[in-house]
Amino acid sequence: MKMKLAVLPGDGIGPEVMDAAIRVLKTVLDNDGHEAVFENALIGGAAIDEAGTPLPEETLDICRRSDAILLGAVGGPKWDHNPASLRPEKGLLGLRKEMGLFANLRPVKAYATLLNASPLKRERVENVDLVIVRELTGGLYFGRPSERRGPGENEVVDTLAYTREEIERIIEKAFQLAQIRRKKLASVDKANVLESSRMWREIAEETAKKYPDVELSHMLVDSTSMQLIANPGQFDVIVTENMFGDILSDEASVITGSLGMLPSASLRSDRFGMYEPVHGSAPDIAGQGKANPLGTVLSAALMLRYSFGLEKEAAAIEKAVDDVLQDGYCTGDLQVANGKVVSTIELTDRLIEKLNNSAARPRIFQ
């Protein structure tokens, strides 16, 4: 298989973790006879400094002619006092909109070697393997009007707006994902209060008729936020609207014990997607070899799975990550029992060693 990838390293530790992910990707693709062309582009603060905008047209052109996007991280205090239109995060929001990325997938998986790093009790997190599917392009964050009004601007209004099509496509995506996992889907809303949530629930029920093998349940967002802490292992796939998903996915991120481990995918209706780690740009450790590359590496694995259907290669990367952690190798943000803290580059070297060793083993059963 041949693929063309847009590579957007971004700011802070973004270039370091992106280098790691590209090295791992090249290894697993070469081992299995696939070919990738990588084309770098600017986004965020780096783009502001060089091109005067967080999302240059050249970057959009590169992304449009690519099969998928890999992104490192955007932002940092250097640009905090810029006008709103010149903030690094505007580049990310603009890219999502321009590329039609409406579904954010946030996998949350507990690793045996990191259970003690979780703020939750070991027995509550050891079997956690869930995905939060968040709608990205509608809801309160994009509704109009959104303004201050009245005398002295002492009244404020934000608008929560969704179309039927926007709700249908995100719920459809969640059912498709649940169907290839454990066939359980929790649709999260606030249907006891919000009209938008009542429509959301109606559409979920309509869509469920097409997926009789998937068990659909409805949960209120306040109950879900409690259950994510009390019993996270009950969840398989969670689907929800934009703001609820923003909050719940950040809450769920603490389960693993490190933001540095978490990948994410932003998808549209076809196989195209943008893949990035959940963590920020961490400018305080940029260039010091301390950055944890695993969230970006695991994001690359998601890319192979969802954009290219390369399940075997994606699983190989995920197994290499697990094996390296089992061997005790980690960066400083990870609390691995009897762990050996190594640099970004050395941790990447260990991953590549695992992948090459696995590829070199004779395959008795084909």
Curated annotation (Swiss-Prot):
Show the taxonomic lineage: Bacteria, Bacillati, Bacillota, Bacilli, Bacillales
Functional summary from the UniProt entry: Catalyzes the oxidation of 3-carboxy-2-hydroxy-4-methylpentanoate (3-isopropylmalate) to 3-carboxy-4-methyl-2-oxopentanoate. The product decarboxylates to 4-methyl-2 oxopentanoate.
Q: What is this protein called?
A: 3-isopropylmalate dehydrogenase
Q: Name one GO molecular function term.
A: magnesium ion binding
Identify its protein family: Belongs to the isocitrate and isopropylmalate dehydrogenases family. LeuB type 1 subfamily.
Residues binding substrate, per UniProt: 96, 106, 134, 222
Give GO terms for biological process: L-leucine biosynthetic process
Q: Does the keyword Manganese apply?
A: yes
Record organism:
Heyndrickxia coagulans
Q: Which Pfam families match?
A: Iso_dh
Q: Which domain of life is it from?
A: Bacteria
Q: How does it assemble?
A: Homodimer.
Residues with site note (Important for catalysis): 141, 190
**UniProt EC number:** 1.1.1.85
Entry binding sites for NAD(+): 76-89, 280-292
Q: Give the UniProt keywords, A-Z.
A: Amino-acid biosynthesis, Branched-chain amino acid biosynthesis, Cytoplasm, Leucine biosynthesis, Magnesium, Manganese, Metal-binding, NAD, Oxidoreductase
